Amino acid sequence: MSDEEIRNEYTILERSKKDTQAFGELYEKYFERIFTFIYRQTDDEDLTADLCSQTFLNALSHVNKFEFRGVPVSAWFYRIAANEVNKYYRKKKSTRVFSIEEIRVKELVEISSNEYNEELIQRLIGYLKKLPTDMLEVLELRFFEDKDFKEIAYILNITESGAKMRTYRALDKLRKNFNLSIKYDGKK
């Protein structure tokens, strides 16, 4: 997202402090992305709908507290959504669910055509689901949500170097356990 697009979103958010109708533009733009982000962590449409509604309700009710930090407004929504999901699982004391799409795993891993097989992808998905939550969160945001490290740091309330380190460690585990080449540039 360009700096100009980020500033435009920030302007809309500023307008929504006085006119809640303006918030609708951001809601329309990001609802589906936030819904999908939450759904991957719940695998339950009704629960996802509730948590997504709560995410946007919290954002709207706290719009006056929003501070611009150079990241897209979407990062703020993702942060609220991540907090809502964490709060839900803490309250329920249940195991977190991660629904990982096979197609996204195929995009993540560079597999030459002669090495590719369905069994490998299924084993990889199973392994990803067993990763510690902090590692899976960064992989999801980085590769499935296409967030840069600055946004990941903001969403997870960690430093940018912490986001890079978690990503590197998670990918290193995958490389070692599956002897795979993983798409990772470490820059963005």
Predicted regions located by residue number:
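N-terminal module of bacterial RNA polymerase sigma factors
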Residues: M1-R33, G186-K188
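Amphipathic, Lys/Arg- and hydrophobic-enriched alpha-helical face
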Residues: Y27-D46, H62, L128, N177-L180
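Structural recognition of an alpha-helix C-terminal capping motif at a helix-to-coil junction
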Residues: D50-L57, V71-N83
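Arg/Lys-rich amphipathic alpha helix in sigma70-family domain 2
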Residues: K65-F68, R79-S99
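DNA-recognition helix of helix-turn-helix
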Residues: N86, L124, M135, L141-F144, ...
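Internal acidic/polar
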Residues: K87, T95-I121
